[in-house]
Amino acid sequence: MSFFSVLSELLEASGFAALTWQNIAMILVSFVLFYLAIVKKFEPLLLLPISFGMFLVNLPLAGLMDEGGVINIMSYGVKSNLFPCLVFMGVGAMTDFSPLIANPISLLLGAAAQLGIYVAFIFATQIGFTPAEAAAIGIIGGADGPTSIYIANNLAPHLLAPIAVAAYSYMALIPLIQPPIMKALTTKKERAVKMGQLRKVSKTEKIVFPIAVVLFTSLLLPSVAPLLGLLMLGNLFRESGVVQRLSDTAQNALINIITIMLGLSVGAKAEGATFLDISTLKIIAMGLAAFCFSTIGGVLLGKLLYLITGGKINPLIGSAGVSAVPMAARVSQTVGAKENPTNFLLMHAMGPNVAGVIGSAVAAGFFMMVFKGTM
């Protein structure tokens, strides 16, 4: 056997021979996401594992998604809805609901920022998707990755890959997508508004709130209990003050581990041969439209409240009504600080932001109640 024949056989058995243009295209997309995560620092905790999962799965013959493959094993946490629910528990342990409790009007802003969910649902039904598929696509507009995975698993499991990738990618790209919309819809005067300090919230209120939310929402929409139940359990860990170890684990070690596995699993759904088709492009377009309309809905209600209150509410906090916590609130703070460096909107924006988490989960529960039997 000659050297050249050995070399030829080696090349034929290598990934180079099996590399397709779809793999190359997705690898290039992963490089763009690497750049955004590492250089631009666009939510690297999410974008870096997603982009690396996308990169790995498009390396031919690696077997990562084969039966028994390491990422395939991880992906069971996505398919079973375990990861989304555990992420919600970690988010609950990290979240202070005081801004929402102190300023209940934030609930309205959180609700208005779900506009994109329903707009995308209507659009999706008009371009060939079933109502159940359209509902799963629409949830992307809530900028809530765990909820998007949860509803896709239940209503449109065959669309889980593009929905999950779109939802998490747009969450990570919030600092790029939202500011132009926010600036286009508000005046310099509105963006510079300084809001008054929020009232102090008692410990009793903080403890009663998660219990009351789960009680009401789960009785109204039972299908939302796994998500909101674990979200509020994590928050109760935090606010009770008696299980500090559980709270620390949920908001640090546990959510970090789950984020790594969830990010890799979501990114690994973007395999070139199955990901690059017309339905995926439609979903990505619908997801972007949903996200933009959600931002628009929140800002427009913020402008209305600005007028009603005589200029006491900064419309920028409305854009934080999407449920990407705390990314959307940070964007409101950043845009507001550019107009008025002494402005501190972060805590005010956290009210609509955490309301958006509840709002998107409730929207998902409503869709599941209506469309679960129509798959």
Predicted feature descriptions by range:
Residues 1-69:
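N-terminal alpha-helical transmembrane segments of multi-pass membrane transport
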Residues 33, 55-56, 77-101, 234-237, ...:
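Hydrophobic transmembrane alpha-helices of secondary-active transporters
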Residues 39-47, 64-74, 94-109, 243-251, ...:
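Interfacial helix-loop-helix linkers and transmembrane-helix boundary segments
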Residues 76, 80, 88-94, 109-119, ...:
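Alpha-helical membrane segments and immediately flanking helix-loop junctions
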Residues 100-121, 271-298, 349-353:
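Entry/N-cap segments of selected transmembrane alpha helices
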Residues 159-176, 286-294, 317-320:
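Alpha-helical transmembrane segments
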Residues 169-242:
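Membrane-embedded hairpin module used as a gating/binding unit in multi-pass transport
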Residues 214-298:
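Transmembrane helical segments that form the transport core of multi-pass membrane transport proteins
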